[in-house]
């Protein structure tokens, strides 16, 4: 229900207006992994923001992407969208996609793909939203709910056969719970490979010259990968797990694997676990995502501070947690920014907010006027904003009547009080009648005593002011 057209925010209290406009023509670059879902997502956020999009599909996914784009285009036109709201290059190539991104009619590039293609997007001289690779570490700390952590890991890593860039690529486990972890994973259909089997798997999965994943692996099940590697595993195998002692080029399977294959490390404690996770992120995963399973809030907070990742997923499956709005409040997205660490422009879960030009209209605000009798009295429209800056007020007692509440005037006062830096406490007494009697004063005084304010605000006419003055007097001088 987010508004993305015209006036999207009008703040009468601070006198500004925000107006949303589209960025313009979007060049959409899509990968061979998650091709159709990326097409659907980018088309939807462009439609929501009134930006036409022209796709350059990966040549290996041209047919399925075209099929998806045709369905979306036809549905959009049927709903009233312009005829050419969704377009694509019919004969794909790297050269054609590059020409699209550099075309003078394109206003912004929205790129998902290999690091080379994303780098090209940022080299066009146009605003670009590109995303980087995700070599995601998952740290399972000794205080974690281990059964749940294993379930989350399997759920995430097997989803779409591990094709999600936010899926866990390596699992790092405290050694004093490692045996229990292994037993749970074995019980749930995972297989730990021997050193010989790991070498066979490496030969099949990794290009020895480039040190990168062979394209034929992506999207295959654990059983298919094992068979292609010459490894015998049970037919119900969900994940292949490889024990590694290090990270980097000397350990080929420590790369992003985009498959139901996990590298596995054990560590002595959280300090060593953090360092291992940082190593994994630095090996072509910086800025993307890191995962921790723990019940220790201090450990979780420290992990968040130390990891160079735009998303820290806590006690959740990473694939589903990173894309947002399932296990957390993250913005739903299939385009996950990696920030400056990943050579991207944002760490956002890219969505409609990234595809809008927001114009801000700032109206003149009248300077507050005052005179001292003996303290300051502000008047003119907007004068209550001074409540944001008054010194030494922490507990505010508001005396008013029901009419002021219904008119929204009390809420205006509270609005400015809530903008203070000290998180002040507020109590409202709204039982002042047009002709208040002494009982009104006594009843309000009892509430005031319990609340112990250091400031009183009277809001309304003479009745509210008189009651407030009397209450404050008896509060300050209870012996009268």
Positions of predicted regions on the chain:
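Short acidic-hydrophobic, aromatic-tinged amphipathic segments that line or gate anion-handling sites
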Residues: 88-91, 264-268, 377-383
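ATP/NTP phosphate-donor binding region
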Residues: 368-455
């Amino acid at each position: 229900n987010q508004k993305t057209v015209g006036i999207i925010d009008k703040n009468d209290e601070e006198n500004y207006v925000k107006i949303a406009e589209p960025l313009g023509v979007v060049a959409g670059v899509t990968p061979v992994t998650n091709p159709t879902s990326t097409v659907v997502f980018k088309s939807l956020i462009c439609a929501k923001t009134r930006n036409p999009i022209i796709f350059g599909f990966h040549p290996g996914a041209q047919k399925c992407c075209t099929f998806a784009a045709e369905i979306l285009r036809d549905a959009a036109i049927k709903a009233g969208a312009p005829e050419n709201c969704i377009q694509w290059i019919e004969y794909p190539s790297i050269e054609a996609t590059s020409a699209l991104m550099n075309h003078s009619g394109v206003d912004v590039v929205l790129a998902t793909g290999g690091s080379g293609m994303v780098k090209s997007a940022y080299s066009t001289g146009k605003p670009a939203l590109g995303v980087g690779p995700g070599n995601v570490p998952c740290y399972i700390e000794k205080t974690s709910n281990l059964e749940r952590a294993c379930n989350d890991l399997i759920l995430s890593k097997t989803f779409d056969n591990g094709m999600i860039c936010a899926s866990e690529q390596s699992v790092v486990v405290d050694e004093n719970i490692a045996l229990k972890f292994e037993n749970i994973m074995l019980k749930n259909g995972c297989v730990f490979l021997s050193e010989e089997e790991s070498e066979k798997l490496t030969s099949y999965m990794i290009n020895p010259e480039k040190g990168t994943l062979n394209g034929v692996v992506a999207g295959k099940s654990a059983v298919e990968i094992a068979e292609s590697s010459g490894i015998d595993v049970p037919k119900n195998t969900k994940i292949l797990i490889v024990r590694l002692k290090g990270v980097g080029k000397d350990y080929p399977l420590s790369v992003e694997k985009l498959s139901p294959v996990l590298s596995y490390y054990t560590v002595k404690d959280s300090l060593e676990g953090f360092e291992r996770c940082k190593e994994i992120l630095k090996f072509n995963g910086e800025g993307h995502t890191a995962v921790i399973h723990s019940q220790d809030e201090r450990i979780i907070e420290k992990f968040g501070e130390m990891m160079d990742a735009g998303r820290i997923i806590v006690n959740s499956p990473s694939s589903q947690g990173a894309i947002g709005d399932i296990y957390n409040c993250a913005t739903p997205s299939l385009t996950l920014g990696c920030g400056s660490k990943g050579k991207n422009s944002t760490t956002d879960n890219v969505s409609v907010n990234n595809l809008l030009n927001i114009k801000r209209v700032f109206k003149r605000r009248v300077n507050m006027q005052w005179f001292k009798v003996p303290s300051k009295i502000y008047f003119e429209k907007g004068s209550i904003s001074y409540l944001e800056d008054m010194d030494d007020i922490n507990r505010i007692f508001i005396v008013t009547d029901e009419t002021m509440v219904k008119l929204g005037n009390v809420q205006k006062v509270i609005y400015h009080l809530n903008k203070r830096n000290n998180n002040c406490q507020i109590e409202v007494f709204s039982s002042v009648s047009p002709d208040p009697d002494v009982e009104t004063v006594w009843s309000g005084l009892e509430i005031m005593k319990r609340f112990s304010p250091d400031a009183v605000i009277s809001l309304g006419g003479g009745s509210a002011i008189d009651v407030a003055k009397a209450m404050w007097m008896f509060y300050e001088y209870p012996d009268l």
